[in-house]
Structures are given as structure tokens and as C-alpha cells.
Amino acid sequence: MRLSVRELVEFVLRDGDIDNRNADPERMAEGSRIHRRIQREQGDCYEAEVSLSLTVDYEGITYTVEGRADGILTTGEGVLVDEIKTTALPLEEIDGENRVHWGQVLCYAYMVARQRSLPRLEVQLTYCRRETGEIRRFVRPYAFEQLETFFQDLLFQYRMWAEMQEEWDGIRDASIRDLPFPFSSYRPGQRQLAAAVYRTVRDEGRLLCQAPTGIGKTISTLYPAVKALGEGYTEKLFYLTAKTITRQATMDACEKMAAQGLRLRTIVLTAKDKICFCRDADGNRNGECNPDGCPYAKGHFSRVNDALYDLLGRCDLYSRAAVEACAREHRVCPFELQLDATLWCDCIVGDYNYLFDPQVYLRRFFDIPQGAYTFLIDEAHNLGDRAREMYSASLSKSTAWAVKKALHKKEALTRALAALNKAFLALREGDTEERTVTREAAADTLLSPLNQVADETALWLKTHPGAPEEDAVLSLYFDVLRYLKVAELYDGHYRTLLTFAKGDITIRQFCVDPSALLSGCLSKGRSAVFFSATLTPLPYY
């Protein structure tokens, strides 16, 4: 069984509440820059970004655990393994007792100690506050025996899940070997399409396929991909489409194969806005993913593993209704439960954004360089336009200013918003006309005030739970985070659109050509099949 250090540690050690007020969401690119700065400051004795892998046999199961240590410091006094975390919180609020953070660095330390035959070493958690660059460190010494005991205890707690997965793999593969095509005969062209898909998965390639409506594209792509999975050519299927009705057709195809004896864990992912249990009087999601605003968030992580084990034992096909029923029984968040279930599913059915969108892609799968995944991309003619939207972002001066006015009193956030407003005004560069202008260069002058706004909104949300302005601040926060994320992608494939109208200024980072970004996402898997009834002109796609 292969898994990452982060996956193992978070799965075993997580507990407590979901709380989006305490989150440090989606500041990965900025966090990476801070990591690199801290690493450079440590000197020549500090090895940065050290890849680690350890294969061990534990109670009859072989585990390969992989990860990357932020830093290893080797001096005459010994070895220290460092884990760096960025935060928006004041450092005095960091108590150095985060179980998951310590769990990660202890795993890395054990792997290093084992590889280098070290009887003892030190482990360090380094916290850096983004806003100020201040650093706080926590250091603890460990003997090899202590590290080994900790690591083996993690595997002991994970054993039930590993045994379940090994048993399931055997059941699934046996059912696939005997699985016939679920219809009495192939339609014209269907066999050729299925054969091409199978070869593509087997050979780790990419296939662009135009097939007429009515040929049965769903089963013609899914069936051979399932066969290839049973033969070990891929480990997980992602069936991605822009339409809800197509996702239901995929589940129908899986049910058809299940009637022929297939055992395949398949889940259809539902957007958070649709599956969330917490609604206001008008039926809209209230957005309060925290223990004060949602009873399903309170204690979620302490109950979710029991809920997950229950869900996986109930059936093979996990619809929205199945996930919701289990989540209500165990009082956990249905959205997070379905995401956890994906780790144990063979086929994941969902929207394009779960692979391609820089804000909502499935990090548990696609933050690693490459997985043994196959992407089946339906209605592929829609992907180009959707990608341009996913890789673009807009902000308006009026939206940020409205939040500042709503807050009234002077505080750090209002000062940050005032600075952002000033940066917006500077974008006019003396232009007084009401019009839209296009520029090739990015508006880099906005980035510093936007980062400041992001940090201050994160702190404000933490310290003002339930405030009347909370929804407006949260909405602005996510808009700013998206803009900053897209800014990290900005290159020659982008243009900046500035619209000056009625005293307002709107800036849009528009992705003209998303092909390189799409290709980067596809590289996260081994094979991909694009299919549609309309893929002309072919050179364009």
C-alpha cells in the first residue's frame, strides 16, 4: 500500500471541528515563497525539500510511505529535521501543540533516522507569520526508539483501513476479470472506440475522440477503462463532465455493469453549495463552516472516520442521497465526507473543476507529481471555454470599498482596504474615459495590498464570528484569494482587462490560452481520453 506522510498522519490524528475561521486557505504559492526564503537563510548545512520514501512490512501488509521534508540541518552537534508552516495568526496564538504538524515532522524524522542509522536527532516546527515575516520555532529531541514507536502506532491505527482496502482490491479485480460488456451487442463504431480507449490507458497515452451522438460514449469509454483498471494499468478513474445529466448517465452505466457482477466503488461528487445541510430561511447555504454556525462542523473530525467506514460498507455506488443519509446519521459534514470517500473509491465522477480549477481541485490526489490515474473527459468541446473561466479572475474597487464602509470603525482591515482602494485608483494612470482597456502586463502593483487584505480578512473572520458584516467579508476574502491564485499563473497566455465605468474600476486577469495549464493538470495522471460528438476543427482542440 502506497500513501503519503500527510495522508497517513492527517487520517489517523485528525480530531475536533471544521472551522473555516481558523483556516489558512489556499495561500500555497505564497507559502512556498516563504518556505524558500526561510530555507535559504539556514546556510549550507541545511538541505531543503528532501524527498523521502520508506517501505516497511507491518503485520502482514507492505507500506510505502512517501513525503518531502522541508529541511534537514546537519551540524557537528547532530541532525535536525525541520517542518515549516505559514500562518496568518499572531505567533503568540501558536501553542506548538498541533498533533498533525508534529505527526508529519516525526514521520520525516523517523525516515531520516532509519536511512542514516541515527540513534537520536531533533525535530523542529517553524511557524512564520505571513504578514510580518516573524518566526517562532519549537524544538524537541527524540531517540530513534521513540520515533519508531510513534510510526508503528500510526500504522497500527491505519491497519484496519489497509486490510479493508487489500480485501476490496481482490474482490474488485475478480469481478472485473469476469465482467462482460453490459449489452447484448456493440453498436456500430462502439467496439472500435472501446478498443482505442483500452489501448490508451494501457499505453499511458492521450486520446482525442469524436463520436456521433447515440453511439453510447459513456459505456464505450467507461467499460474499457474499468477493464484496464482490473489489469493494473491504472489505479483510479476520474470521469469528468460539465453537465449534471451526464454525471447521472455515468452512474447509470456503473449500475448497468454492477448488474453484470461488477464491484467498483464509484462516487458522484456534489458541489458544496448543493450538498451542505446548513441553510438559511430562504434555503441558501449560510456558509458557516464552523462549530458555532453548523452542528455538523462541531466535532466532525472526531466522528468522520466512523462515518466513512460505515458508508464504504453500505454499498458500492455512492450517490448524493447515500452520502447525505450517512452524514446525517453520524452528524458530519456531507461535503467533507464525500471528499474523504474518494480516497477509497475506484471511480470518481464529477465536474471538470475537480481536476482543472486552481481553487477547488482535489488536492489529496493532484498535489503529488503524478498518480496512476486515468481521466475520462466527456463533452470535451466545452473544456476550452470552461478553462478560460477557471483560470481567470476579476475584482472591482467598489466591492472592496463597500466592505470598508460596512466595517465603520478604523482597524487593520479597513486600513488594508483603504490601501487597496488607492492602488485601484492608480491603475487609471491619468485615463479619465469610461472604457475597457487591454494590457499585456499584469497589474503587479495590486499584489502587495491584496496580500495584506487577505491576511487581515483571515484575522478579522477569526476574531469576529457572527458579525453582521461576516458574509460580505468572507465573500471578498474568497474573491481576493482567487485573484491572487490566478496572479501566480499569469504569463504570456494572459491579458489584463481594465474597465473604467461610473466611478468604478474592475480588473480582470483573463486567460486567453489555457492549453499549457490544462496540460499541466493532465500530467497529474497517466492517461486521458477526451470525447465528444463535436471536436471540429480538430487542430484547434
What residue ranges belong to the model's regions?
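Walker A/P-loop
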Residues: 202-224
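Walker A/P-loop NTP-binding motif
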Residues: 198-199, 218-233, 252-257
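A contiguous, basic/glycine-rich beta-loop/short-helix subdomain that forms a polymer-engagement track
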Residues: 323-348, 358-366, 459-541
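Conserved pre-motif I regulatory segment
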Residues: 167-210
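Mg2+/Mn2+-dependent nuclease catalytic core
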Residues: 54-148
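A substrate-engagement module of RecA-like helicase motors
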Residues: 173-176, 180, 233-348, 356, ...
